[in-house]
Amino acid sequence: IKLDIRDENNVAAAMAQAAEHFGGIDILINNASAISLTGTEDTPMKRFDLMMDVNTRGTFACTQAALPYLKKADNPHVLMLSPPLNMHAKWFKNHTAYTMAKYGMSMCVLGFAEEFKPLGIAVNSLWPRTVIGTAALAMFSGLVKVENCRTPDIVAEAACALLVKDSKGCTGNFFSDEELLREKGIHDFDKYAVDSTKPLQVDLFLD
């Protein structure tokens, strides 16, 4: 599906297309993000708008458009790939705009979880304990090397573990990938490391 989540009409059409193809929508994963780890003077308003439009507004738009379909699902889940709301100033000072945009997604978790609770729709957050080796590493300006990361597999498996939970009994949580996998009895995470001989880089927003 071709989708620009900044365009609410495009989003609505994509949801309708997905629902028609699959016979409904059981799960919405809000993963699309724009990132720029830049200070105030180095963040053009165009870049600020992009991060807000994709991260916060896009999450709201996709959830709003998916809601009619999620209401009909047997075990509906909305999952945000967003961090816990860590209000320590150090997570704002070097990239206030990005933190605002990303925390907007996390604020949606809090609001949607309470709003949709009577509907039985779960809304939770998932955030990796370590930096994940994806194309987004380029935005870290060389501060993080891929060998100090884990692979996306750990996030995918954690998401699967979460999305099979009873939606009526698990909502409004901010989970880490390690936490969800430990619940499944997985305690050895070396297999997820890009290079298990190298130290891992803890992800943003985690102390």
Regions found by a protein language model. Name each.
Residues 39-49:
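Substrate-binding pocket helix/loop in short-chain dehydrogenase/reductase
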Residues 125-126, 144-207:
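C-terminal helical subdomain
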Residues 30-33, 76-83, 122-127, 171:
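Structural signature of the Rossmann-like NAD(P)-dependent dehydrogenase/reductase core
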Residues 2-13, 45:
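The beta1-alpha1 cofactor-binding region of Rossmann-like NAD(H)/NADP(H)-dependent oxidoreductases
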Residues 63-64, 110:
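A short, exposed helix-loop element centered on a Lys and neighboring polar residues
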Residues 24, 106-110, 116-128, 168-175:
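Conserved Rossmann-fold SDR core element
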